[in-house]
UniProtKB/Swiss-Prot annotation:
The protein's Enzyme Commission number: 1.6.5.-, 1.7.1.17
Cofactor binding mode and count: Binds 1 FMN per subunit.
Coiled coil regions, renumbered to chain: none
Keyword terms, alphabetized: Flavoprotein, FMN, NAD, Oxidoreductase
SUPFAM superfamilies: Flavoproteins
Protein family: Belongs to the azoreductase type 1 family.
Quaternary structure note: Homodimer.
Required cofactor(s): FMN
Entry protein name: FMN-dependent NADH:quinone oxidoreductase 2
Matching Pfam families: Flavodoxin_2
Function: Quinone reductase that provides resistance to thiol-specific stress caused by electrophilic quinones.
Gene: azoR2
Length: 216
């Protein structure tokens, strides 16, 4: 069983999303035997944003006259897609930045959203090719966006749900810590609530993994 763990917060010791993903991964290891993890820190080791040259290298393979940089970027794109497709569980730390996801996470998504690899177009419309995965997103936000007057500005969780759904990933769980910029009291209460929700999420994911194993 393979786990892909991604962090994208530009913060380190003070990052709420990193604290949450660390606890999620720890609890997953305790709940699921033989869980092999691959970790990427998308902020510490950022992936280059999509360019014309990088996109041209998705498919087919780079031409013989491609420069070394293009060949290297193609190899990285292939590695990122392979890691994603090979994973049974994906854990993503995704704080809200300016109502959306960190640019570092968007760069990774742009590499793995490849026609013919993770989705395809058919006569009946687009079809995701990355189904069967369990996705857990550790979501941290400065204010309250799950409900209330700011809900319409949520282009973070809504974007992730839509994007991974397009790729075929239907089982998406959010561990959400809101109000992180609303003072120590509300921030601490929201973090405690998010941490308390992890146990239920891990149980649900573990059940899904067992169900997948039985079907296989």
């Amino acid at each position: 069983m393979r786990l892909l763990h991604l962090d994208s917060s530009i913060l380190t010791d003070t990052s709420v999303s990193r604290r949450l993903t660390a606890q999620v991964v720890q609890d997953l290891h305790a709940a699921i035997d033989d869980l092999h993890a691959t970790y990427r820190d998308l902020a510490a080791a950022p992936i280059a944003h999509l360019s014309g040259a990088i996109a041209a290298g998705f498919r087919p393979l780079p031409q013989p006259d491609s420069d070394a940089a293009s060949v290297a970027e193609h190899a990285l794109s292939e590695q990122l897609v392979d890691e994603f497709l090979a994973s049974d569980i994906v854990v993503i730390g995704a704080p809200m930045y300016n109502f959306s996801v960190p640019t570092q996470l968007k760069a990774w998504i742009d590499r793995i959203a490849q026609p013919g690899r993770t989705f395809r177009y058919t006569a009946n419309g687009p079809e995701g090719l990355a189904g069967g995965k369990q996705l857990i997103v550790a979501s941290s936000r400065g204010g309250m966006y799950a409900q209330g007057p700011m809900a319409s500005l949520d282009f973070q969780e809504a974007y992730l749900t839509a994007t991974f759904g397009f790729l075929g990933v239907r089982d998406v769980y959010f561990v959400r810590a809101e109000n992180q910029s609303r003072g120590p009291g509300p921030a601490a209460a929201a973090l405690i609530s998010a941490q308390a929700s992890i146990a239920d999420v891990v149980r649900s994911v573990a059940r899904g993994v067992v169900h997948t194993r039985v079907e296989a």
